[in-house]
Curated annotation (Swiss-Prot):
HAMAP family: Succ_CoA_beta. Mg(2+) binds at residues 209, 223. This is Succinate--CoA ligase [ADP-forming] subunit beta. One of its GO terms (molecular function) is magnesium ion binding. Pathway: Carbohydrate metabolism; tricarboxylic acid cycle; succinate from succinyl-CoA (ligase route): step 1/1. Succinyl-CoA synthetase functions in the citric acid cycle (TCA), coupling the hydrolysis of succinyl-CoA to the synthesis of either ATP or GTP and thus represents the only step of substrate-level phosphorylation in the TCA. The beta subunit provides nucleotide specificity of the enzyme and binds the substrate succinate, while the binding sites for coenzyme A and phosphate are found in the alpha subunit. It comes from Bradyrhizobium sp. (strain BTAi1 / ATCC BAA-1182). It catalyses: succinate + ATP + CoA = succinyl-CoA + ADP + phosphate; GTP + succinate + CoA = succinyl-CoA + GDP + phosphate. InterPro entries: ATP-grasp, ATP-grasp_succ-CoA_synth-type, ATP_grasp_subdomain_1, SUCC_ACL_C, Succ_CoA_ligase-like_bsu, Succinyl-CoA_synth-like. Binds 1 Mg(2+) ion per subunit.
Length: 398
């Protein structure tokens, strides 16, 4: 689960992390009071969407102006003008795709007098089962670009959760950022604060880009991106309360209600599969035969008829889907349950695109019988390769 920048900063501030003062704004008419409360003389007006690259992004609407999603204002009138332009407009960045995202919230923040910019992030290293720190003196830019062009400027080290963060980890961060004296001490303190917040809130990633040194000699978090481990959210109702469903894919929200593992993609062939490994293999073979999957969807091992029907409805709700491939290897999941769910869903929502079904495993004969006797126009497949070729051919009109 992701949250907005202003929410991430407020959360980090609870752990003592230094941030600039700011006020979230949801309506243009609230920007004046927010700017006056901060005082100025310089303000930063930031679009709040769940995507990076906001500063270099562009709004679709001409009425939003030709500046990006992060704007510097030097007067309260300019703050108000930016708020009117940006709220409700659609911001397109390198991470939103061409459709962009509507800006429903702004964060008006005190401007910072910046001397240096750094990059600092924490994430779960699944290979070592430790918390990894990623540090670079190249802040304020895309870290992927740094990794590609000058990888030697990125330094990583890990913290063992069994022992927790230690003073030497803070010194390692200070050294990586080439800080000394009081700034080194600030970096050491910040390292402990960030790690404590990361663990306490069960974060999956905490990215600060940039972490800045002000001309007054203070370390400050200028931008923060936080994502949480969804499996741990039950422990953190205060985090769940921060969820902004308008930033999420509507189909993914619906899937979560049925405990379905669904991820929307950009292709045209919808997939319903049981098991994450088989789902990925199904996506791979669709691509092998020249087309792209429209989604990742794992219905799990113990899905009911109702759950399968819900999954099918979610797939058909995607206007980009031009064909559907159901690929089930029944172990715990029974093929007849899948068949009943598919038939029920198709009869309710109709079938306007080709459907290929490959069933194998527990109750496979009964499952095939249910589908064949349903009267539906379903293409049966004998194996995964056969299924992929049939759905690709059907979608292409062959």
């Amino acid at each position: 689960m992701n949250i907005h920048e202003y929410q991430a900063k407020a959360l980090l501030h609870e752990f003592g992390v230094p941030i600039s003062k700011g006020v979230p704004v949801l309506r243009p008419e609230d920007s004046d009071a927010a700017a006056k409360a901060l005082g100025g003389p310089v303000w930063v007006v930031k679009s709040q969407i769940h995507a990076g690259g906001r500063g270099k992004g562009k709004f679709k609407e001409a009425s939003a102006g030709d500046k990006g999603g992060v704007r510097l204002a030097k007067s309260i009138d300019e703050v108000n003008a930016f708020a009117k332009q940006m709220l409700g407009a659609t911001l397109v960045t390198v991470q939103t795709g061409p459709d962009g995202k509507q800006v429903n919230r702004l964060y008006i923040e005190d401007g910072s007098d910046i001397d240096k910019e750094f990059y600092l992030s924490l994430l779960v290293d699944r290979e070592t089962s430790k918390v990894a720190f990623v540090v670079s003196t190249e802040g304020g830019v895309n870290i992927e670009d740094v990794a590609h062009s000058t990888p030697e400027k990125i330094i990583t080290f890990s913290v063992d959760p069994a022992t927790g963060v230690m003073p030497h980890h803070g010194r390692a961060v200070a050294k990586a950022l080439k800080l000394s004296g009081d700034l080194a001490k600030q970096a050491e303190k910040l390292t402990i604060q960030l790690y404590t917040a990361f663990v306490a809130k069960d974060m999956a990633m905490l990215e600060i880009n940039p972490l800045v040194v002000t001309k007054q000699g203070q370390l400050r978090v200028l931008d923060a991106k936080v994502s949480f481990d969804s499996n741990a959210l039950f422990k953190h109702p205060e985090v769940v309360a921060l969820r902004d469903e308008t930033e999420e894919d509507a189909k993914e929200i619906e899937a979560s209600k049925y405990d379905l593992n669904y991820v929307a993609l950009d292709g045209t062939i919808g997939c319903m599969v049981n098991g994450a490994g088989l789902a990925m293999a199904t996506m791979d073979i669709i691509k092998l035969y020249g087309m792209e999957p429209a989604n990742f969807l794992d219905v799990g091992g113990g899905a009911s008829k109702e759950k399968v029907a819900a999954a099918f409805k979610i797939i058909t709700a995607d206007p980009n889907v031009k064909g559907i491939l159901v690929n089930i290897f029944g172990g715990i999941m029974k093929c007849d349950v899948i068949a009943e769910g598919v038939v029920a869903a198709v009869k309710e929502v109709g079938l306007k695109v080709p459907l290929v079904v490959r069933l194998e495993g527990t109750n496979v004969d009964l499952g095939k019988k249910i589908i064949s006797e349903s009267g539906l126009n379903v293409l049966p497949a004998d194996n995964l390769d056969d299924a992929a070729q049939k759905i690709v051919k059907a979608v292409k009109g062959g």
